[in-house]
Amino acid sequence: MKYKDLREFLTLLEGQGELVRIKQEIDPYLEMAEISDRTLRKGGPAILFENPKGYRMPVLCNLFGTPKRVALGMGQEDTHALRELGKLLAFLKEPEPPKGFKELIGQLPQWKQVLNMPSKVLGKADCQQVVLSGDEVDLHKLPIMHCHQGDVAPLVTWGLTITQGPYKKRQNLGIYRQQLIGKNKLIMRWLSHRGGALDFHEWKEANPDKPFPVSVAIGADPATILAAVTPIPDTLSEYAFAGLLRGQKTEVTKSISNDLEIPASAEIVLEGYIDPNETALEGPYGDHTGYYNEQEYFPVFTVTHITMRRDAIYHSTYTGRPPDEPAVLGEALNEVFIPILQKQFPEIVDFYLPPEGCSYRLAVVTIKKQYAGHAKRVMMGVWSFLRQFMYTKFVIVCDDDVNARDWKDVIWAITTRCDPSRDTTLIDHTPIDYLDFASPIAGLGSKMGIDATNKWPGETSREWGTPIKKDPNVVKLVDEIWDQLGL
């Protein structure tokens, strides 16, 4: 399925009963977040608030509030099909030459999709139908949501921040929350390992004291939005991956005030710069952990231009204790991760990030164990192979007879196959999300690996237990007479 823009996607969702329009006046201050939270928790539809209190612009929430809508946004019917996207990413990350003509023919569909990777640059774009500059710029006129009563200010949540480092050809798209602090000022909260922060760091070294150009797109097409949160290889641009998802090239146009390319169909675009010498104290905000985070200084984004479509839609979300939209995205994108990990570690059978683990803080891996110490190798691989798992605090490794997605199965494996002293691996002084206040130092903490696999010679000197198995003949017999037993 191809969606040229966000509006085409909303039309499809509405036709499937996956979008509800609310005409009643609803306040962006707390009320929208409360309604969105209740709706998401019951697996409800996306919401278009058509009458925000005090504003003329409608607000879209809960767009990716179910795994099904995430899959639809990526052009698939369900989350199971996302495995194929993961296989494509694994292929692009480490392409292998075909071993023969038959394998070459088999790879043609993948290479054909590569033709959709280059962006298509438009001279005229819908996202620039309305242009505001100078004193016309006033962020207070946007219906920016205030999500929790303890939040310090309204927060831009679904903005796609577009940056480019001085030494890179490709541009980076990332989603970083942005605190409103003035009519043309936002605080750009990005962690040091994220693409935008890395671009900014390189810019400051190459261009001391010079403003760093930034554009932020709000309400892009679903493929571009989801490309910004998908674990794509560092060498692949988000626009290129969006083209793969969409099955046609991503249409972009040049920003009015800088050379950055922006999604041509975006609802709203904020353009401006970051002064390397200007920072502000960000937070506190309720975040995906279910707690308010600590305050910290981050760069200030000065907005010089706002461009938008006529009758623009403001796209927003909230974060809080799971389930929330980031947790749902994590659950769906879990299926994309698996083939990427399996390409590097073929012994991995399943990989699961439980939503209640705040999207990425705990992982359960099942493997076909082949030798003593195998579980520890997989732990180290999870922590080091993909940047997305740099902040995963707990990795539990089980055998392939355990269902990684069933806590009863996992806990049984831990309690019967794991000795706390022998099978727990602790690593200190590792990168940790600075929002994790449980770590002793902001940004630096420990990790725990739990080996819940059956132990091999060399891992134990005791005779290992034999699992109880039912007699298949008796099971078949009881199946045949079950309906006669009145049970």
Curated annotation (Swiss-Prot):
Pathway: Cofactor biosynthesis; ubiquinone biosynthesis. Its cofactor is prenylated FMN; Mn(2+). It is found in: Cell membrane. Binds 1 prenylated FMN per subunit. GO terms for cellular component: cytosol; plasma membrane. Its EC number is 4.1.1.98. Mn(2+) binds at N172, E238. GO terms for molecular function: 3-octaprenyl-4-hydroxybenzoate carboxy-lyase activity; metal ion binding. HAMAP family: UbiD. Belongs to the UbiD family. Catalyzes the decarboxylation of 3-octaprenyl-4-hydroxy benzoate to 2-octaprenylphenol, an intermediate step in ubiquinone biosynthesis. This is 3-octaprenyl-4-hydroxybenzoate carboxy-lyase.
